[in-house]
Curated annotation (Swiss-Prot):
Encoding gene (name): gL
Membrane topology recorded in Swiss-Prot or TrEMBL: Peripheral membrane protein
Name this polypeptide is given: Envelope glycoprotein L
Quaternary structure and interacting proteins, as annotated: Interacts with glycoprotein H (gH); this interaction is necessary for the correct processing and cell surface expression of gH. The heterodimer gH/gL seems to interact with gB trimers during fusion.
Organism: Human herpesvirus 2 (strain HG52) (HHV-2)
Stretches assigned to the gL alphaherpesvirus-type domain: 23-201
HAMAP family: HSV_GL_alphagamma (MF_04034)
Signal peptide: 1-16
Chief site of localization: virion
Stated role: The heterodimer glycoprotein H-glycoprotein L is required for the fusion of viral and plasma membranes leading to virus entry into the host cell. Acts as a functional inhibitor of gH and maintains gH in an inhibited form. Upon binding to host integrins, gL dissociates from gH leading to activation of the viral fusion glycoproteins gB and gH.
Amino acid sequence: MGFVCLFGLVVMGAWGAWGGSQATEYVLRSVIAKEVGDILRVPCMRTPADDVSWRYEAPSVIDYARIDGIFLRYHCPGLDTFLWDRHAQRAYLVNPFLFAAGFLEDLSHSVFPADTQETTTRRALYKEIRDALGSRKQAVSHAPVRAGCVNFDYSRTRRCVGRRDLRPANTTSTWEPPVSSDDEASSQSKPLATQPPVLALSNAPPRRVSPTRGRRRHTRLRRN
């Protein structure tokens, strides 16, 4: 149960780490999961506040042949979704809304010749996942972000609370996730696939990139 406590501390730390309107981003790390019960004992996540964004830890290499289970926790407010690698004994939290959207897309297309039983099962699963997403409309927004905004993995309001300035900057200010050095995920050789993004330094619009010069294309019209 120790990993559950550590996981909870990492998650809960973001709620009290920063106050006011400062943009906050933090990483949701994987958990040790030797068996299914370890995943089921992880507490449900709360939907992030308006000024908080979540970024999910991605393994450096994903061997999909080793994914032994996909868990969509229906009772959680954000439909917490885990990918379980039993060989590595780890469970990875993924963006539930992106994952479910892709899953629904897969279910809507028949890969193999469908029979009556397969079609009925696939339709039932499609309906359940679609209803699960529909009941969580307040947990995620599909509004587009403004031009130049680099949105994080999960921002409830999709406000541009953090971004990389597309122009070269003289100074940078990085944010380190509030994770203790003795966290169970720190024992991994590559805990993060990418570096934490740089917080916004200004609200200036990004520079325009001129189109690449190339050869002109000539279109010939055929006359009948």
